[in-house]
Amino acid sequence: MSKRTVHNFERAVHLVMEGDPLGCDLIHLYYSKSPSLNAFINYLLCFYCPCKPPLEVCYKSVKYLYDTEKLSPSEYAFLIERLRKWNH
């Protein structure tokens, strides 16, 4: 990724986390062949955007981030609990 692309990705992440719908639209542009990056993007979409991926994708993304040590056990448990509440 070029420096400009990274800057734009970081900006899209900030927009998503601020609740700006534009960020949710932009973050889709960064799907790649990197499973870690895709899991992170899906995490953002699942927890910060109104148009969420299927629940199964959210579970798999959180599990992948945990399995690759991007989430602590307590973060993982918290996010899984939030996903379970969506089912009710």
Curated annotation (Swiss-Prot):
Highest taxon above the source species: Viruses
Return the protein name: Uncharacterized protein ORF88
